[in-house]
Amino acid sequence: GHAECRIFIVEGEEQLDKALEVRARLPSLERIIVMDPEGLRTFRDPQVLTWEEFLNLGRVHRAEHPAAVEARLGRIAPDDVAVLIYTSGTTGPPKGVMLTHRNILWTLESLHAVVGFRHDDEILSYLPLSHIAERLLSVFVPARFGGVVNFVENVDTVMENLREVAPTILFGVPRIWEKLYSAVSLHMREVDPVKRTAYRLTVAVGRRAAPHRWKGRPLPIGLRLLYGLCDLAVLRPLRRRLGLHRVRSVLSGAAPIAPDILGYFWSIGVPIREIYGQTEGSGPTSVHREGDVRLGTVGVPLPGVEVRLAQDGEILVRGGNVFTGYFKDPAATAAALRDGWLYSGDVGVFDEDGHLRITDRKKDIFITAAGKNIAPQYIENKLKFSPYINDAVVIGDRRRYLVALIVIDEENVTEWAQDRRLPFTTYTDLSQHEEVRGLIAREVEAVNKTVSSPEQVKKFAILPKRLYAEDGEVTPTLKVKRKAIMEKYADLIEPLYASA
């Protein structure tokens, strides 16, 4: 309703039922188009068309008005709105971001200068197309540069489809890389000692080689020979098993990722470059360049993009990628766009070489009762490096110490529990098992040893369920909706402070 859409395209009967339920509240709606009409053979509604009927309307119209399409194309100006993309809603209600044709084409050319898209690229599409990253890589990039887009069967088959497709370009949200790392780590714990030792030695060699590759430097002769042997014997088969043996350009974005995860993939020959941006910037703002990678940063601004920091550290962006405003929301537009600069809502710093490091979302940084500034994502990323922790939400605003809500990794914890013959029947049963709590406690303690005293998690609770976008707990790209979770699970949080 907010977007004033005239046409509603749905997949099949289930989605059609949902559309029919709300159409009375959509005064702009003229047609509902059904892609798969199975089960609707006898259904009749003057507002509903099948995809084929919709195409036939176009054929008839073009026959009667052969110049109509070209005439409409001729009236489109570069600064006309091309697409409305709604924000993920992590810090408030979703807002409709207006991106122009100029925004999109300018961003494509700037990103192409860094990534180098090719007409024969293979792309794996697994995020909702409502997300700017997926729209950019799975729709706009192929339309401009060519390539083949492969859509996953469903969210549960992403890893399997990754192996089948073996893409040449892959954009991965942190959860993808975390799951791949966890899968390899746990598999290697189960293999025989000889294979496990060979793997560990190989990764150690890869870690020695990685800093040279970050800088685009040739490896010293001895290391080059050793790494070549390791790559041939272990790493190349491992990349093939993961579906990463053909990948040419690998990007991680949409949320912060732990440098340890990035370092691991570089060590096995998968050169992930971190990319940073937001919907209001048509997607990318900065990215690592080949031969100039700094783990823990998001690289340098794209060609033509300016980035500076406000006095409070907020990241400001200016360039051809910056949007024109929020649809029907002048107040939010005025807050986000000031003097030609986009106020990102993120806080960051530049290192001595101009690489941008993201501290956290401005709204997420909190101050403890002792007056210490805490960036929770830094701690959460360390916790999620554990193969047994799928998600973590760190809490401590105006509190005496930090606590965390933990979501276990179901697959890995299940395997761990079965190896120890622990009795359980459901996910909830597993998550609340005393020995599982002990496992997570050890993982939390390991992280606490790597951070300062104010950043240590003193207590935690394990959530009895997974986090779902449908429940308003995470975004479609699996970013945690912090405020919603803190409100929903207040009854678990407060007891963690009750005995303090």
Predicted regions, residues:
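Conserved C-terminal "lid"/linker of ANL adenylate-forming enzymes
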Residues: 391-394, 400, 444-500
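Conserved ATP-binding/catalytic segment of the ANL
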Residues: 87, 301-368, 385
